Every structure is written in structure tokens, then in C-alpha cells.
């Protein structure tokens, strides 16, 4: 099974976006 650069990019994005929103939400809740 070949892993293309596109798939790596999509997987990275898919894991980064929720983490980013969770971080923003956590910061706004702490204020």
C-alpha cells in the first residue's frame, strides 16, 4: 500500500484542525 504525500497532508490536517480548535476553546474558557 502506497502512501502519497497528499494522504500524509490530509491526515496531518485532519489531526491538527481539531487540536487547534480544542486549544482555542480551552484558552477562551480559561479567561
Curated annotation (Swiss-Prot):
GO terms for cellular component: chloroplast thylakoid membrane; photosystem I. Signal peptide: none annotated. GO terms for biological process: photosynthesis. The chain crosses the membrane at residues 7-26. Keywords: Chloroplast, Membrane, Photosynthesis, Photosystem I, Plastid, Thylakoid, Transmembrane, Transmembrane helix. The keyword Plastid applies. The keyword Secreted does not apply. It is found in: Plastid, Chloroplast thylakoid membrane. It is a single-pass membrane protein. InterPro entries: PSI_PsaM (IPR010010), PSI_PsaM_sf (IPR037279). It comes from the Eukaryota. Belongs to the PsaM family. This is Photosystem I reaction center subunit XII. It comes from Euglena gracilis.
Amino acid at each position: 500500500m502506497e502512501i502519497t504525500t497528499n494522504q500524509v497532508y490530509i491526515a496531518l490536517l485532519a489531526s491538527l484542525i481539531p487540536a487547534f480548535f480544542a486549544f482555542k476553546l480551552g484558552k477562551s474558557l480559561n479567561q
